[in-house]
Amino acid sequence: MLERTGAEREHTPEILARATAWFDASSESARSRLLANIMAGLPGAYERYDVPGLKAALARYHGIGKADLRQNFMRFLAAVIPTAEEVGINMCVHPNDPPRPSFGLPRIVSNAEDIALILDAASSRSNGLTLCSGSLGAGADNDVPAIAGRFAERIHFAHLRNVAKESDGSFMEADHLGGDTDMVAVVTILLRAQKRRLEEGRRLRSKRSPPTVTDRLRLVCEISRTPAAPAS
């Protein structure tokens, strides 16, 4: 579809064979729909790319590998986190979505190892994590509850999503209790971390901050007229 140089080296022979079979059997309208979906909502795009525009954007990153991208991010943290500490801001990096190379671009926030490297690079509370259970859950080897537990004290924001994965690596958004991630375990870990912070006297949010996990659960319970369960 994109005729991107080197794309065939990034996929297994089985996926390439399936893609070729689909392309040969598909209509022009089906191909146009697929291309529109590929171009919709790409990261870093304020407007929808066309094929030449996407290729031009990708060309800017030619020769930049995972180590280069990670080193650049570490330089960013070294420059920004001290100021964040001074003014009381909690930075929180969002995991890559999907958590694997995309369009030939490397990923540096895809799993527990990546997260540990980032948080250790600036061992400050201001250098934290957005726990997106959907992004991390799309990785076949990611144990999202384990990641939540390991980095609980550095999680400053959470995107509570769930996804269902297929054997070929495809994934789709799922109901909160209908995907592959144990969302009850994830929420339990977050509530326990929130309780610890309250007991330590830590300020969880300012007046303008988004609601906490407990706030959201309480709202759901009020809507359903069910008493909210205490955090434990």
Regions of interest found by a model, annotated:
Residues 14-16, 27, 50-65, 74-90, ...:
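Histidine-acidic metal/acid-base catalytic patches
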Residues 97:
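Residue-level "edge-of-site" marker
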Residues 1-70:
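Extended, charge-rich helix/loop segments that form flexible
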